[in-house]
UniProtKB/Swiss-Prot annotation:
Keywords: Iron, Metal-binding, Oxidoreductase
Species of origin: Pseudomonas putida
Disulfide bond positions: none
Lineage: Bacteria, Pseudomonadati, Pseudomonadota, Gammaproteobacteria, Pseudomonadales
Protein name: Superoxide dismutase [Fe]
Superkingdom of this protein's organism: Bacteria
Length: 198
């Protein structure tokens, strides 16, 4: 069965003024879609035919991994964002962030540094480790925490195509704007153990 491009969970213009309609049209409809098309061209006739996207990400390498992980990462990223979102988490997630980082402001500062400091194209992540603790991670290219057994909670796409139309080379300005869109309800669901299937 062929993989399909999941629709955005909101309208293309819903994240303005922080992320423009034009960026989402290119980022989702073209870049994300290209990874889906590539994956559908690469998988037939391989051991990965008939596997779920998550299974492919965890067990593949090379071109199949790169495209599968980028499909998964992008679908996860879209869900990490929402219109009229941002602010701070509450409840158990907020408690865990405070325990791991000292305060929400310290977490925000460290996550921002991790994302802005990712070398080249990649992703900044908040993950839950197997022991339940929270940690930050930076992955290069198509890197995905699923391959290390971590549970992704939040990601910021720092490939240039995520922000270049709106912010040109100013990655820090994009990451600053990202905080206005974080969908803490979704992040909390991941923290509480809801399994995300892209």
């Amino acid at each position: 069965m062929a993989f399909e491009l999941p629709p955005l969970p909101y309208a293309h213009d819903a994240l303005q003024p922080h992320i423009s309609k034009e960026t989402l049209e290119f980022h989702h409809d073209k870049h994300h879609n290209t990874y889906v098309v590539n994956l559908n061209n690469l998988v037939p006739g391989t051991e990965f035919e008939g596997k779920t996207l998550e299974e492919i990400v965890k067990t593949s390498s090379g071109g199949i991994f790169n495209n599968a992980a980028q499909v998964w990462n992008h679908t996860f990223y879209w869900n990490c964002l929402a219109p009229n979102a941002g602010g701070q988490p509450t409840g158990a997630l907020a408690d865990a962030i405070n325990a791991a980082f000292g305060s929400f402001d310290k977490f925000k500062e460290e996550f921002t540094k991790t994302s802005v400091g990712t070398f080249g194209s990649g992703w900044g992540w908040l993950v839950k480790k197997a022991d339940g603790s929270l940690a930050l991670a930076s992955t290069i290219g198509a890197g995905c925490p699923l391959t290390s057994g971590d549970t992704p909670l939040l990601t910021c796409d720092v490939w240039e195509h995520a922000y270049y139309i709106d912010y040109r080379n100013l990655r820090p300005k994009y990451v600053e704007a990202f905080w206005n869109l974080v969908n803490w309800a979704f992040v909390a669901e991941q923290f509480e153990g809801k399994t995300f299937k892209a």
